[in-house]
């Protein structure tokens, strides 16, 4: 294909967001409508966000899904996830609370499936998105973006301090395979 020689808009695939997609729910989990959700690294199943869940934050549940009954298996139900969208979450407390003075674009970390905080708590919390202001009721506006949050989480897990841009690039390549 040749380079463009005049204005032309490419076809859009999905648009700029928000995106919705259905993911399988982990057996033993109950996802509430509005829960911040994590996709587990080991199985690909979705669970409500918690600091203990190993995986990436993927978005917010559009409806409830309950797989806590005996005899249920991974993926018996799916939950629709909304992502790359702005959501309002409960603000953290004390030194972890956001305020109007917080800079737009600051990282936001999850503390549970409905609460966010300003710090990673020594990397115990995962990044879930970016700060976009405060609501009048004190809730925090967060742009939930799993791709960018995953990059931040990997970079924060690096144990060395790269000496150069080349070393940083090597770390990123190693982290993402």
Predicted features by range, described:
Residues 1-177:
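Surface-exposed, low-hydrophobicity beta-strand/loop segments enriched in small/polar/acidic residues
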């Amino acid at each position: 294909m040749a380079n463009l020689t005049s204005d032309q808009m490419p076809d859009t695939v999905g648009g700029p967001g928000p995106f919705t997609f259905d993911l399988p729910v982990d057996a033993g989990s109950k996802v509430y409508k509005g829960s911040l959700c994590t996709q587990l690294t080991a199985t690909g199943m979705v669970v409500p966000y918690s600091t203990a869940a190993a995986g990436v934050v993927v978005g917010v549940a559009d409806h409830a899904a309950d797989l806590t009954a005996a005899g249920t298996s991974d993926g018996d139900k799916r939950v629709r996830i909304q992502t790359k969208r702005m959501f309002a979450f409960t603000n953290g407390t004390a030194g972890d609370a956001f305020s109007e003075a917080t800079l737009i674009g600051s990282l936001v970390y999850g503390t549970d499936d409905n609460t966010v905080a300003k710090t990673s708590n020594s990397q115990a919390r995962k990044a879930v998105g970016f700060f976009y202001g405060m609501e009048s009721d004190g809730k925090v506006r967060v742009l939930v973006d799993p791709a960018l949050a995953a990059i931040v989480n990997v970079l924060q897990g690096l144990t060395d301090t790269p000496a150069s841009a080349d070393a940083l690039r090597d770390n990123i390549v190693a982290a993402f395979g």
